[in-house]
UniProtKB/Swiss-Prot annotation:
Residues at which S-adenosyl-L-methionine binds: L76, G108, F127, S128, K129, M130, T131, L132
Localization (cell): Cytoplasm
Lineage of origin: Bacteria, Bacillati, Bacillota, Bacilli, Bacillales
Transport among keywords: no
Disulphide bridges, residue numbers: none
Keywords: Cytoplasm, Methyltransferase, rRNA processing, S-adenosyl-L-methionine, Transferase
Record's protein name: Ribosomal RNA large subunit methyltransferase H
Cellular component annotations (GO), alphabetically ordered: cytoplasm
CDD domains given in the database record: RlmH-like (cd18081)
EC number(s) reported in the record: 2.1.1.177
Family as reported in the entry's similarity comment: Belongs to the RNA methyltransferase RlmH family.
Residues making up the signal peptide according to the UniProt record: none
Amino acid sequence: MNISIISIGKLKEKYLKQGIAEYLKRLSAYAKVEVIELPDEKAPENLSEAEMLIVKEKEGIRILDKISDDTHVIALAIEGKQKSSEEFAVSLDRLATYGKSKVAFVIGGSLGLSSEVIKRSNESLSFSKMTLPHQLMRLVLLEQVYRAFRINRGEPYHK
């Protein structure tokens, strides 16, 4: 399985970079995983609704440029479906079973994802109803993907 994590914004925090590197190393035994980091759109603090839409649309174009037609796209969004680790593992296993060798998880910038990215997505996933920093979501997502592979193979780790 080829997994892409497509995210908006440059990761600056060393501790997040270290955690991501660790999970990418662990995941290399199970799948080819790449993190695609796209630049965020510079925007002032107090944006109007129209300006927010423009920012999301520009970031959305960058995201869509990285997704091929044969990729199963999972958008990370607060309004997405919440799953347990076991349910998530089953979802990934089903994708592999039914020939979806390319999977892309999409993490938007601080304003979220454009409507075009949501439309292109095959499903939407939420890790919480709480708002989480999009930089932190990369690490949380990679940990859950790793956990899913361990669950699916019956290997110790998941508790």
